[in-house]
């Protein structure tokens, strides 16, 4: 039995201005010091937070503590998903937007190669269920965090396909996908394709918060598509729509 997650880095990137994604498997990124301004900075744990900008800072240690608590929940999501999708495994990165009450009101998948919407939704629910540190000096705190999971099941990994391997299907998919998305933004899709050319499972990372509501529609479009057969063993492929 493989270890459920290869490594989960708790060096969370706390965003003060422009969000930067912490790449999966990379070393923890040090948090940049807050820019000097003429306005006095409020105390970290103050109950009366001074709102000076849209994006505020977060207590790094407190955020790391939340991620330590959610590890088991995220792992359980993958385990449950692997009961349905035998070859489930991969990387996933989240965006968590935290309001002044410490609630994760804006949580979504930023990128993922898990290839299972149900598992990704389970993970989002885990992150939303936790209380987070309140942002300081802004209306909203932003966290970007990446995780990596090995396949829970003792199985041969799927055949790795590139987008070129499904080029014919993608040409037919774009028009139907646009009906879901309105033609706005680029959605990152990962799917497992069985030996008959049907999608076993599909996961999607939307381009922004508004795109989250369109993901389920897009998943159904891909599931109903016909792909070429990968041969005698299922394939895994990532592409954009």
Spans of model-derived segments:
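C-terminal motif of bacterial Sec signal peptides marking the signal peptidase cleavage site
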Residues: 21-23
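Charge-biased low-complexity segments
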Residues: 25-241
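Bacterial N-terminal signal peptides that target proteins for export
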Residues: 2-15
């Amino acid at each position: 039995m493989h270890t459920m997650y290869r490594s989960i880095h708790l060096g969370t990137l706390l965003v003060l201005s422009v969000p930067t994604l912490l790449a999966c498997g990379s070393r923890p990124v040090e948090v940049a010091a807050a820019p000097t301004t003429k306005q006095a900075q409020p105390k970290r744990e103050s109950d009366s937070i001074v709102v000076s900008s849209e994006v505020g800072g977060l207590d790094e240690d407190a955020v790391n503590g939340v991620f330590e608590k959610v590890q088991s929940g995220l792992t359980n999501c993958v385990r449950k998903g692997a009961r349905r999708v035998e070859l489930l495994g991969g990387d996933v990165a989240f965006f968590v937007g935290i309001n002044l009450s410490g609630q994760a009101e804006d949580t979504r998948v930023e990128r993922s190669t898990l290839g299972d919407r149900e598992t990704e939704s389970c993970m989002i629910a885990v992150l939303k269920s936790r209380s987070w540190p309140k942002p300081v000096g802004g209306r909203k705190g932003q966290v970007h965090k990446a995780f990596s999971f090995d396949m829970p099941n003792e199985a041969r990994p799927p055949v790795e396909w590139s987008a070129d391997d499904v080029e014919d299907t993608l040409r037919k998919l774009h028009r139907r996908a646009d009906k879901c998305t309105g033609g706005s933004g680029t959605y990152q899709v990962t799917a497992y394709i069985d030996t008959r050319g049907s999608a076993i499972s599909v996961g999607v990372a939307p381009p922004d918060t508004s795109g989250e509501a369109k993901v389920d529609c897009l998943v159904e479009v891909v599931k109903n598509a016909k792909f070429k057969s990968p041969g005698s063993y299922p394939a895994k492929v990532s592409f954009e729509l």
